[in-house]
Amino acid sequence: MPDLKERAARKEPGAAESASRESRGGNTRESASSAQGHRSRRFNRRSSTAALTPGSAQGRGVQTAPRAPVGHGGLRTGLTSRCPQPSARAKLPSVTRGAPLPPSPGKGHFGATPISHRLGLTERVHDASKLDCHLEDRKSASSLESRGKEVMPSDFWDHLKEQLSAVPPDFSCALELLKEIKEILLSLLLPRQSRLRNEIEEALDMEFLHQQADRGDLNVSYLSKYILNMMVLLCAPVRDEAVQRLENISDPVRLLRGIFQVLGQMKMDMVNYTIQSLQPQLQEHSIQFERAQFQERLNKDPSLLNHTTKWLTQAATQLIAPSGSCYDIQDPSSSSGPSPSDIAIPEPLSPAMVLSQGFLNLLTWDPENEEFPETLLADRSRLQELESQQNQLTILASVLLVASSFSGSVLFGSPQFVDRLKRITKSLVEDFNSRPEEVMQTVSDQVTEEIHQSLKNMGLSPLSSENTDSLIGQLQNIAKKENCVRSVIDQRIHLFLKCCFVLGVQRSLLDLPGGLSLIEAELAELGQKFVSLTHHNQQVFAPYYTEILKTLINPVQTLTTKVGSL
């Protein structure tokens, strides 16, 4: 708290100017050094930050939330009209940590509401439970909005530079900026951090800073250093490097601009953390709410599960009498040893296998088939996205498999070559569904040229004309649905997803079927999305699936197996 001299200086600035400046400077230095002294304790606190242990989180099927930034709060909407607005004026969602979730609606709450509206509300709750927590990644670096934020706010910083360079300096914009920074710092604090709150309130006391500005001795550089020390104390580990880079900036305007930018990122970190910390509650609330809404609709329409029953019946029939396939055809990259194919279909049938087969069937669903399972209507668009992603991976893996059979381990032993070939193929197959023949013609030309150039760079013999023609022909044949290489890869990706549903993604990645090792990272992403979607759906509709599967599976088995225990 300010001492008596400082308080007297505020009341009589003309009589106690020297004492006030001296006293205030001492307090500010003490606050800055105090924040600086917390560096080591901050890192100690990181190691002891409360987090869900693997046992407690995974045992309940809840993903562990990342370490929280030290505080939370919301950005203000903008500076006053006297100054142009800076670039970090991000409009963030207003999220309050610890805010209670809305209670589940009671019986009859939607009594007069149309069913279509209730279904829409259920879908919105369903979407909220799957909210993307990485908000800052939503915009491309080359997007129009991103470019605008880089160019337009330069007016503010140019204006600030002109004001600080004037004789005498004009601190009006600097004061508005310091006020905004102060509020951001305060918003990053937790309620229990009262000592830090008092430090910030004292060091960035706007009344006193206005007095200094009126006298022309406001030390912007010194205040910036204090703010940096406080940011070191408050930022999440991911921002340490960015804050450290700011310490090397000597120009006051560039430093303030960097501070404001990093503070915006720190705010986003807190929003992301708050959302992630609420995910388990959102998911649990979503499960209960979706099930209650579905049961209400089922009570009014007993035929609501007809399509779901037909969907599961078809899956069980496929497992009892599987159709022949070319899955056993070997490819040049396959290796000896066990793979997920060794655990293909257990006998007799189990609820897990019927459900996994049913979920996989949705990835090849005929768009004209209107008998889509009622329990998965809210996820239909997500399933279509997964289908598109899986189809692109099928084409990518097929291209890599064919290319490796011609160039061998010489080129495909180079991670740089494989990554380059994957980038080329990925960029070209995005339009595969609309024009497969044309796309594969381009892919075959690009891949052949890449192989030829790489062999030449390594001093190796290029492909013969015969091998080149054969490579181009095999790559172009991938455009046909009946192509056996494409069919093999497609079935193996489906088998991988089935293993993910039963065993989990990490265990399924340990023994990938032949031909899939080069797309392991992409498969892991696909598998995680598939498992997340299907497990949530299973949790919501487990009671209904259990009742349906009782009529499809040997009753003796079902007595000891329940869908909910998978």
UniProtKB/Swiss-Prot annotation:
Pfam families: Tcp11 (PF05794). One of its GO terms (biological process) is spermatogenesis. The chain crosses the membrane at residues 393-413. GO terms for cellular component: acrosomal vesicle; membrane; sperm flagellum; sperm midpiece. Residues 332-341 have a biased composition (Low complexity). Its main location: membrane. Residues 1-112, 328-347 are annotated as: Disordered. Residues 25-37 have a biased composition (Polar residues). Residues 1-24 have a biased composition (Basic and acidic residues). The modification Phosphoserine is found at residues 104, 461. Plays a role in the process of sperm capacitation and acrosome reactions. Probable receptor for the putative fertilization-promoting peptide (FPP) at the sperm membrane that may modulate the activity of the adenylyl cyclase cAMP pathway. This is T-complex protein 11 homolog. The gene is Tcp11.
